[in-house]
């Protein structure tokens, strides 16, 4: 049985004067733009009680009311894919995602994804938008993700993400030696030419990352990055933008760099590192049902630890 969606929101000043479909996407981000547009056309999403078109301009102060039935995501297969679950109750589950697992079906990845696994593990999650997925990790990024098991939990988690009260802290190994930490406040949007890539662009969405140095090596740095926003590829784009791309990043990696007179093992490991060296290490949020602040930590994966050990050996051999 499908759940009923009942949401209401007032258009804030900063969104006034935009198209209805654009405003709806900002106020109800847990639903896809195409789904929202369909509800607008069907009269399920009204403005001050009136049915408008998606392209109609709406001013600040207007009341948006959404009353619709959440359709089950029956087009996706439930698949028995092993998940490393670090926490689960009737409202949420937290997983430790391995490298290579795509989060959501897309072109080229119609099955074998986290969404397919969730539909098998929690069948009722089919009634939750996007099978409860409220934030994503790239295919080859490892670490912690929270998933909502109910519509109420989904709504509250999305609200926390919008309010930037969910703490997401990552660790990365980057190319280059960073002298000190800092903040990157640079908007992110689609690359002007390579549409599959993201880039720092003036017309992009606000994106803020805070980074600090954990350990320096001869030509690399182990960093910790805290997200204030959660844009697509944010850490990868931001670190590359300031000149410190992630080791192993096939898209934003930039120039390959090897410390002078490095061991063959280190050289080979750096050349063949199979993914971007990025791990979602810490996750902290308010439980959507109890309000209790909860925190989880994921240990660094083996490939990450192996590279760190080789970089330490290289530094010590050089200093010695």
Swiss-Prot record:
GO biological process, one term: enzyme-directed rRNA pseudouridine synthesis
Entries under CDD domains matching the protein: PseudoU_synth_RluA_like (cd02869), S4 (cd00165)
Localization terms from the record: Cytoplasm
Record-annotated active site: 138
GO molecular function annotation: 23S rRNA pseudouridine(1911/1915/1917) synthase activity; pseudouridine synthase activity; RNA binding
Catalytic activity: uridine(1911/1915/1917) in 23S rRNA = pseudouridine(1911/1915/1917) in 23S rRNA
Catalytic class of the enzyme: isomerase
Similarity field: Belongs to the pseudouridine synthase RluA family.
Identification of the protein by name: Ribosomal large subunit pseudouridine synthase D
């Amino acid at each position: 049985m499908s759940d009923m969606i009942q949401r209401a929101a007032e258009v804030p000043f900063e969104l006034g004067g935009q198209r209805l479909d654009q405003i709806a996407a900002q106020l109800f981000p847990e639903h896809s733009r195409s789904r929202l547009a369909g509800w607008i056309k069907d009269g399920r999403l009204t403005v001050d009680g009136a049915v408008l078109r998606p392209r109609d301009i709406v001013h600040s102060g207007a009341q948006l009311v959404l009353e619709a039935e959440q359709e089950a995501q029956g087009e996706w297969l439930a698949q028995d894919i092993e998940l490393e679950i670090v926490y689960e109750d009737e409202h949420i589950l937290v997983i430790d995602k391995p490298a290579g697992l795509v989060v959501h079906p897309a072109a080229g990845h119609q099955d074998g994804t986290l969404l397919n696994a969730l539909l098998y593990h929690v069948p009722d999650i089919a009634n939750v938008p996007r099978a409860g997925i409220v934030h994503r990790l790239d295919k080859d990024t490892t670490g912690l993700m929270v998933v909502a098991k109910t519509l109420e939990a989904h709504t509250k988690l999305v609200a926390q993400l919008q309010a930037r009260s969910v703490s997401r802290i990552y660790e990365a190994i980057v190319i280059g030696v960073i002298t000190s930490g800092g903040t990157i406040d640079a908007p992110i949007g689609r690359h002007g030419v390579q549409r599959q890539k993201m880039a720092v662009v003036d017309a992009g969405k606000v994106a803020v990352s805070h980074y600090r140095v954990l350990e320096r090596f001869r030509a690399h740095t182990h960093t910790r990055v805290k997200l204030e926003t959660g844009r697509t590829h944010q850490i990868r784009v931001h670190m590359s933008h300031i000149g410190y791309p992630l080791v192993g990043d096939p898209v934003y990696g930039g120039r390959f760099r090897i410390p002078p007179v490095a061991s063959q093992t280190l050289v080979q490991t750096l050349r063949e590192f199979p993914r971007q060296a990025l791990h979602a290490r810490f996750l902290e949020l308010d439980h959507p049902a109890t309000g209790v602040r909860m925190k989880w930590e994921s240990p660094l994966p083996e490939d990450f630890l192996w590279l760190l050990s080789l970089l330490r050996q290289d530094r010590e051999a050089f200093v010695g």
